Amino acid sequence: MRLIIQPDYQSVSQWAAHYVAAKIKAANPTPEKPFVLGCPTGSSPLGMYKALIDLNKKGIVSFQNVVTFNMDEYVGLPKEHPESYYSFMWNNFFSHIDIKPENTNILNGNAADLDAECARYEEKIKSYGGIDLFMGGIGPDGHIAFNEPGSSLSSRTRQKTLTTDTIIANSRFFDNDINKVPKTSLTVGVGTVLSAREVMIIVNGHNKARALYHAVEGAITQMWTISALQMHEKGIIVCDDAATAELKVGTYRYFKDIEADHLDPQSLLK
């Protein structure tokens, strides 16, 4: 696992965006062999998306031959709802870049058969040869996508009931009314994420410090699903200083030292 420690959220976002852009450019994708990108929602990736939009508008990276698969979607929330993840992606990312609409994939939380929708999603990922780079964020309890504590580390795309903690956390997007927050979701599984050729997770803020500790120094356990990243041969966590508050001093210094030559985001595109 690589741990890239940046001073603040803006630096985290810039590094992550430049890393994604560099991976897309290096792959030299074509319509026949596109670059397949896994996309998260929430507050963590917003800065990265803004930076990627800027790189796209400057002509540094193109998304014309990129196919995306989103991590999750609420069940029962109309896709036109301002808090649906469909709306989130189009408002904050897709509508600002040169991606083809037909190349974007988001789970349908209003499908007549939710199990069939999840199976279809997994099959479509396979049809593209898997995901090249899965981006993500985590919750304070270490969950990836909507894989709450206790989720199987080999799980695939399925329907999940949200925990009370997640519902309360997400109520900030629903007028702080927990009754407006959907209680279930469709989500890729931990196994789906780990099947990607590379995984990059953004962690920022003091409230994620305990989760980062479990991700880097803790045991691999379903109670902290982010800990499964330790098993991935190409896992990267990009974090800010605030999120490292619970890491051992030795761990912090170790990763700062070995990644010292890779902390400038501009160098990633050279």
Curated annotation (Swiss-Prot):
Pfam families: Glucosamine_iso
Reactions catalysed, as given in the entry: alpha-D-glucosamine 6-phosphate + H2O = beta-D-fructose 6-phosphate + NH4(+)
E.C. no: 3.5.99.6
GO MF annotation: an example: identical protein binding
Part of the allosteric site, annotated site positions: S151, R158, K160, T161, Y254
Gene Ontology CC terms: cytoplasm
List of catalytic residues: D72 (proton acceptor), D141 (for ring-opening step), H143 (proton acceptor), E148 (for ring-opening step)
Pathway annotation: Amino-sugar metabolism; N-acetylneuraminate degradation; D-fructose 6-phosphate from N-acetylneuraminate: step 5/5
Regulation: Allosterically activated by N-acetylglucosamine 6-phosphate (GlcNAc6P).
Highest taxon, organism lineage: Bacteria
InterPro entries on file: Glc/Gal-6P_isomerase, Glucosamine6P_isomerase, Glucosamine6P_isomerase_CS, NagB/RpiA_transferase-like
UniProt KW keywords: Allosteric enzyme, Carbohydrate metabolism, Hydrolase
Record bears the keyword Zinc: no
Single GO BP term: carbohydrate metabolic process
Alphabetical list of PANTHER family matching this protein: GLUCOSAMINE-6-PHOSPHATE ISOMERASE
Biological role stated in the UniProt entry: Catalyzes the reversible isomerization-deamination of glucosamine 6-phosphate (GlcN6P) to form fructose 6-phosphate (Fru6P) and ammonium ion.
Family: Belongs to the glucosamine/galactosamine-6-phosphate isomerase family. NagB subfamily.
Protein name stated in the entry: Glucosamine-6-phosphate deaminase
